[in-house]
Amino acid sequence: MAKFEQKLTDLLRPAVEETGKTLHGIEYISAGNNSVLRLFIDHENGINVDDCAEVSRQVGAILDVEDPISSEYSLEVSSPGVDRPLFELAHFQEVIGETINVKISMPLNGRRKFKGPLVAIENDTLIVEVDSIDYELAISNIDKANLVAKF
């Protein structure tokens, strides 16, 4: 997780938890005046639109006071969904055996994108099987990862 996103997570997690929800993760997409701060929230009973609105109000008040983002941005609050993003080691541990998409920063064997079952996690390294080959991907090298939905 990027340092800025970690700072936002630390700032906003208590506000989300105050509503009885869990902050699954944060994405900040910087695009000039079209930047987006996206919060993914979760709850054991699921998330509905009222939950998102409640968290948006709570978090919006903190962002207005603390003002951690100097440029204009849109705040989006949603559930992680069936293709949930994976941000933390615990998220990966929950989906061992499932198919995931991973995009890494520094290429490994000439590739940056991997899609396959998460076979194991060893010492902060994911082992993802792609075309019968096990790739070892350092969690610190991951740009983005998500669960592949089963239908």
UniProtKB/Swiss-Prot annotation:
Gene Ontology cellular component terms for the protein in this record: cytosol
GO terms (BP aspect): ribosomal small subunit assembly; translation
Gene3D superfamilies: Ribosome maturation factor RimP, C-terminal domain, RimP-like superfamily, N-terminal
Principal place of residence: cytoplasm
Localization annotation: Cytoplasm
Keyword Lipoprotein annotated: no
Keywords: Cytoplasm, Ribosome biogenesis
SUPFAM superfamilies xref list: YhbC-like, C-terminal domain (SSF74942), YhbC-like, N-terminal domain (SSF75420)
Similarity-based family: Belongs to the RimP family.
Function: Required for maturation of 30S ribosomal subunits.
PANTHER family xrefs: RIBOSOME MATURATION FACTOR RIMP
Name listed for the protein in its UniProt record: Ribosome maturation factor RimP
